[in-house]
């Protein structure tokens, strides 16, 4: 165990430094706790909501910055899977004491970004993050996995059916636990399970137009979540 500080980029950090830093993260900081450590220390007021997720959450701030008005924090990390998010959930969500958390995760679990996994492992990680939030008085929004017919970084994979399956479970789990389900899939998906034309440049990550479609879904879900009591244990036993 070490309290060694996180690496800090110099003012002249170049692509070579960034590549080396990514290598350091892969070998020394699997959940990437360092990614938001400094930003978390600078949070002085209770956030309204923290967005936990992968690149789809991370890029939301980049491509739709107006959505992240005061009180909304983005803690997405590109490429991450649910086990990585679960490890950093205490530091990047619970410790900040937000009123609500928005969890959107599963694309990279399906892709196998951190190795072999299973549907049940993904479910358990979602359950664990939701339980941690509720136990700490944080309202929970579960965002559906956005549609995709293929992944450029996983040639040959056809994820559309799996995405629909996992979203079906998310919707049921949210209803069971009295959490809020944000159905981005319904707003973004074409009939074949791909992203609707014009909403993404790669079929996976929403572009500015895609996030514009997601915004009202998120706003409605957050408004609903902040009305739901969060104290106490889950209302029903796990399946």
PLM segments and residue spans:
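Surface-exposed amphipathic alpha-helices with a cationic face
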Residues: 130-134
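A short helix->loop->beta-strand "cap" motif at the edges of active sites that frequently abuts
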Residues: 136-139
């Amino acid at each position: 165990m070490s309290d060694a500080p996180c690496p800090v980029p110099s003012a002249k950090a170049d692509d070579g430094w960034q590549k080396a830093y990514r290598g350091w993260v892969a070998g020394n900081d699997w959940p990437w706790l360092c990614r938001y450590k400094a930003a978390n220390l600078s949070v002085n007021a209770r956030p309204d909501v923290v967005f936990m997720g992968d690149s789809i959450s991370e890029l939301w701030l980049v491509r739709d910055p107006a959505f992240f008005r005061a009180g909304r924090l983005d803690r997405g990390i590109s490429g991450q899977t649910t086990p990585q998010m679960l490890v950093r959930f205490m530091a990047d969500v619970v410790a900040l004491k937000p009123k609500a958390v928005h969890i959107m995760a599963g694309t990279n679990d399906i892709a196998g970004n951190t190795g072999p996994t299973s549907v049940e492992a993904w479910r358990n990680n979602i359950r664990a993050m939701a339980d941690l939030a509720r136990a700490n008085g944080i309202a929970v929004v579960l965002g559906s996995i956005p549609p995709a017919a293929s992944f450029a970084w996983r040639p040959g994979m056809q994820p559309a059916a799996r995405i629909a399956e996992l979203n079906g479970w998310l919707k049921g789990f949210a209803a069971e636990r009295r959490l809020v389900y944000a159905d981005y899939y319904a707003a973004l998906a074409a009939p074949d399970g791909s992203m609707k034309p014009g909403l993404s440049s790669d079929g996976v990550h929403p572009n500015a137009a895609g996030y514009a479609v997601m915004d009202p879904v998120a706003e409605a879900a957050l408004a609903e979540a902040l009305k739901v009591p969060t104290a106490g244990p889950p209302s029903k036993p796990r399946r």
